[in-house]
Swiss-Prot record:
Protein name: Truncated Cytokine response-modifying protein B
Superkingdom of source: Viruses
Function in brief: The protein is truncated in this strain and presumably inactive. It has similarities with variola virus CrmB, but the product is inactivated due to several premature stop codon.
Length: 61
């Protein structure tokens, strides 16, 4: 059974993008471009987190 968790905070600070909830924080650092993030997601199953960041720009990360 997948557990759905609402994102409480999304922040962009220079060369990183973070999503945070009461259970975890995921930060992606990027150096090669300045992407515009359209969507973020994550899920947790058996204490294993999976996440993704989607941009509207082509970007080599």
């Amino acid at each position: 059974m997948w557990k759905l968790i609402c994102i409480q905070l999304t922040t962009t600070t220079g060369l990183s993008e973070s999503i945070s909830t009461s259970e975890l924080t995921i930060t992606m650092n990027h150096k090669d471009c300045n992407p515009v993030f359209r969507e973020e997601y994550f899920s947790v199953l058996n204490k294993v987190a999976t996440s993704g960041f989607f941009t509207g720009e082509r970007c080599a990360l």
